[in-house]
Amino acid sequence: DFDREIAPILATYCLECHKDGNIKGKLNLTTKAGIEKGGKSGPAVVSGKVGKIETSPLLVRVMANEMPPKTPLPIKDKLLLEKWVLAGAIWGANPEAPIDPFRFSTSGRAGYDWWSLKALMPTATPMNFNLNPIDAFILEKLKGSGLSQNPQADKRTLLKRLSFDLIGLAPTPDEYANFLADVSTNSYEKQVDRLLASPHYGERWARHWLDVARFGETDGFERNQKRPNAWPYRDWVIRALNEDMPFDHFARLQIAGDVLEPNNPDAVRATGFLVGGVYNTVLGNDQMRSANRQDELEDLVGTVGQAFLGLTVNCARCHDHKFDPISMEDYYRMAATLSGVNHGERSLPLPGLAQKIENAERLTKNLETELEALEAPIRSALIKERAKTIPVTQHPPKPFISWDLRHALIDSETGLALQPQGPVQLTPSGARLADNSYLKSEPIGKTLHEKTLETWVQVNPGQQQGGAPVSLFKPIDATFDAIVYAELEKNRWMAGSDFFRRTKSFQSTDTLEPEPNTWVHLAITYHANGNITGYRDGKPYGQTYQSSGLLPFEAGQSRVLVGCRLEPAGGNKMFTGTIAQVRLYDRALTLEEVKSSFQHGDIWPNRREVVEKMPPKDQLRHKALLTQRIELTTELQKARSTQGEKAYAVVAQKPNETRILARGDHTKPGKLAKPGVLKALGELELDANASDTERRVHLARWMTSPENPLFARVAVNRLWLLHFGAGLVDTPSDFGFNGGQPSHPALLDWLATVFIQKKYSLKALHKLLVTCATYKQASTPRADALAKDVDNRLLWRMRKKRLEGEVLRDAMLQASGILNLQVGGPGFSDYKVTDTGNGTTYYEPFDSDAPELQRRSIYRFSPRGGETSMLDLFDCPDCATAAPKRTATTTPLQALNLWNGPIAIRLAGTMAEKIKNETKMNQEQVQQVYQKTLGRNPSEIEAKLAGELASQHGLRAVCRVLLNSNEFLMVE
């Protein structure tokens, strides 16, 4: 059977050197045509023709052990190949289908059949009803190696281990005393429940997740500017963990919370995960921006892939993954799925506000329908009468917003007002703008994608370069689309945009300056497909061009500016001239509609003129409806301008087209990549025009599906790593070929299955892990076990762990009695921030005894590249990259810093002073130092030596010694 027997042999042993992109000897073995064509030696085999070994160069070299060159084929596989060739080398069920080089694992790479990509195999627990199921798996493997587990650790050691593991703080003297005095059979389990219910549990485990999420509070790169509102994501992680949010929901919110639950502020905060990484704010030219965007997408794809799937998907940006079954197409499909994600700050939705806005919008729409029913017949009659002398092909289009600046600053359609900014002159000809004056509207009441900007202007050409008669502007991210004059090309109009992102030349041949005191009609249409078309005096202006795509201008966030491109206006190129009319349409007008609007000029009647022609009864009805509509408009504007808390989170944009880039080079786009996922884990492909919402929602649901074997495996392995010091898979973010193999594969799959069954409860999984006998073992080494398993992969003892840098700092603050346990809210900063004035920011650490700076380290401001001697020396990772598994070094500088560092000396002194204020007896003071640092009383010899040290060098010296002791630094 070719598909079951021959294809796996070719994929395993041959395709590394004989496939598309890597064809040695000009021999491609992935297709029937390739194998029949052969290479330098002629056809490799001839399909359908019964042959002999000698007639197949492929088989001759295989049987002679020349191929594969390094390791000959096993006898069994040689015989199968021989049988296949002699029978006529029939290709398979589909002769046209190539062999997928990723289908089978080989000695050099993983295939679709790699262990981590297979469905979960929930093996039955080994039969021992007296054991926690975890212990049954562990003991079965230990027994096979002739080893046994260590005895259980003493109660004091267990409580310290449990407390540091679950909340990152040492047990207090009272907690030690209560546990030691509790002789009930469930005393340990009660401590587990107490610690899991603590608000400090979320703080402890949020730190682990923030390492994976590469969370930082500055942008990185050379500017490295602060992100003052990044902290809401950190607080959300803490709350979610404390509330035991199901881990699948926890993951989905971080990928698509803002679109899954748009009215939930926590769901928006959660998307801080996607934008938690570095962000280059040095914009440069178009080429630099394009290259930078590809780097951002690589960070997104890599972070999502490693955090939730344990796969280095980002390694396939420039070529197919060298070791895992991930193609370039897979990578770019994932990149397309996340291509609507952008960095930025956004206001969080306020409870009930969205519903209030929705109700007001619905009522407004109903009122507008009634108003239109009254106005439409009269408006049509007036237009028809006025148009008798004008050769037009159709009625002019109805604008969404229309200002006639010769009469008023109030929109005749919606009542939206323009506010003068600076010395605007209102004349019978229109608004005369000079001396940096302009007009600004209130937020518009409708989200616009497609649109048309239209205006009648008189330009002062000698004073004009780069100003905008009309601009649609979104302050939240300073994006705008505008009609702009003479900025990039002298005497020419263009579609202005933020940093020229959607701006190209219209290629107009009209280079004459506008005549002074001559009215010019201008319109620019923005189409759904990204096309932008310019018009002047009702005719196409140059050529339509394809932009990078539409941006949404959201209701309540976007304004119309007249005479200015964007705010703040200082330093902007301003429009100088007179503007008579400004219109905004909620769609892209056609050529005929633009032509009609130009030809009609002033024949479009305003609302006042229409109402004057109504019968008195209709006028009264119209007035009542209009009054209600104006009240609703005011209410809507107030609601939309209500700002919630700010958070650094995903600012969604319309996804741009994604193409597979040759060697990852943004200047060499190739085949279109539709949004989708990894082929190795199942098919999911969306249309190329799918919205950002569709893309991220599908990704989040696919990724967290119980059918995805990686999601639960990766999650339970992270918890195992952090409790036991090493994962069942030793590479927590790489379950691919270069990652570790599971030490206990059956246990891993059993845990993943239980995790799913328990509805992804992390607290339930914690409890399962920390109540097993394997976790409660003593950490004492044994010679017999070390001889067989020096790395303790079989878990015959518990690993000793040194406190991580942040936990060490918190423990020192706790022992000194000044740890500030305030939970949540903006963090503290022990950095002096220096802005050089050229856009670069520096962060210099300092030490202080201010109470707000003694909070837990999870709340400490985290700048990228910020140095803090103690934390850095104790292996705190820089947040520029993810750190799924921290290193643990041992260096002389650690000892020097812990003994002589300013923080250590200050806290030792603080502890000594507090104790001396509480008791005057030297013996009691020494006892207090031991209780606060080690949670126990000193032995007789310890008390004697510590008393002598205190007498000679002061109590602070005793505090310094114990803060440097292994017993303080290590968790047994």
Model-identified regions with their sequence ranges:
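Extracellular glycan-associated modules
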Residues: 375-645, 812
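Short, solvent-exposed loop/turn and secondary-structure capping segments
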Residues: 19-22, 26-29, 70, 93-98, ...
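Primarily short, surface-exposed interaction patches in extracytoplasmic proteins
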Residues: 128-161, 165, 169-200, 215-262, ...
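Active-site-adjacent bridging/hinge elements
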Residues: 277-289, 309-312, 431, 495-498, ...
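Extended surface/linker regions that mediate inter-domain or inter-protein docking
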Residues: 187-328, 334-335, 339, 458-460, ...
